[in-house]
């Protein structure tokens, strides 16, 4: 069959890898909601969901059925198009950001030379979902939550990007595969420890996770920018948040902890174990830390995180120049 060319085979393999990787990410994001509730129960010395299936193993299925059959209500005075578009953007933005993450040698959806810039672009796109949701709902609590979320996300994305510049300078590339290969001898978390700390803090803030979940504060804003959402639209916001956690955890592994590299076990297993560890850390942080005031969150970012990232970048540049002499 002459129509089967090497180019066609390469395209089909790329599509297959994209479908497999993105399905795994969505599945991990969905199952993390169940795992979080079970782990929170363990951390707080109480029972988690344990009634549906063996040990609560079918709780996720029950939640999905409930979500499918809930009324997909749209407020009467809302902007219907933007109201519907917002959860789609929230779901797809950080899911697309995972496309640049190499899970093992040769297994990456898009091996871009501007991989880190693509991630920052997708993280910035998620801000529009929040603004669209808050403004289109025609609800004052939604709008206040959206304004908080957009200001917080844009602020912490500054530190998110600056914290990665030390890694880029050491690897000499924005390509994620090149960054993983540059950690063959020493993981970046050792020379870039302060960069890792800042990236982890900013990653939690960008995902709007506790303790940086002021945009969704129940006591102040009645659940924030998605108060008017129900049914599958709310489900897209819900799963999108967990996909963001999976993506940020995978980026921590790729940029600072050697990616798929490790002894004895297959590369994908190492990548999965490292990523699962950081996903559990997100849950442990939620169970351990109180929620600060909104002004404290913004002050912490600009007065502590920003100077720390700038000092880390300057020291990294000085070390690289010294080694080049």
Swiss-Prot record:
The chain crosses the membrane at residues 11-31, 81-101, 114-134, 154-174, 186-206, 237-257, 265-285, 304-324. GO terms for biological process: aerobic respiration. It is found in: Cell inner membrane. It comes from the Bacteria. Keywords: Cell inner membrane, Cell membrane, Membrane, NAD, Quinone, Translocase, Transmembrane, Transmembrane helix, Ubiquinone. The keyword Transferase does not apply. Pfam families: NADHdh. One of its GO terms (cellular component) is plasma membrane. InterPro entries: NADH_UbQ_OxRdtase_su1/FPO, NADH_UbQ_OxRdtase_su1_CS. HAMAP family: NDH1_NuoH. Belongs to the complex I subunit 1 family. NDH-1 shuttles electrons from NADH, via FMN and iron-sulfur (Fe-S) centers, to quinones in the respiratory chain. The immediate electron acceptor for the enzyme in this species is believed to be ubiquinone. Couples the redox reaction to proton translocation (for every two electrons transferred, four hydrogen ions are translocated across the cytoplasmic membrane), and thus conserves the redox energy in a proton gradient. This subunit may bind ubiquinone. NDH-1 is composed of 13 different subunits. Subunits NuoA, H, J, K, L, M, N constitute the membrane sector of the complex. This is NADH-quinone oxidoreductase subunit H. The gene is nuoH.
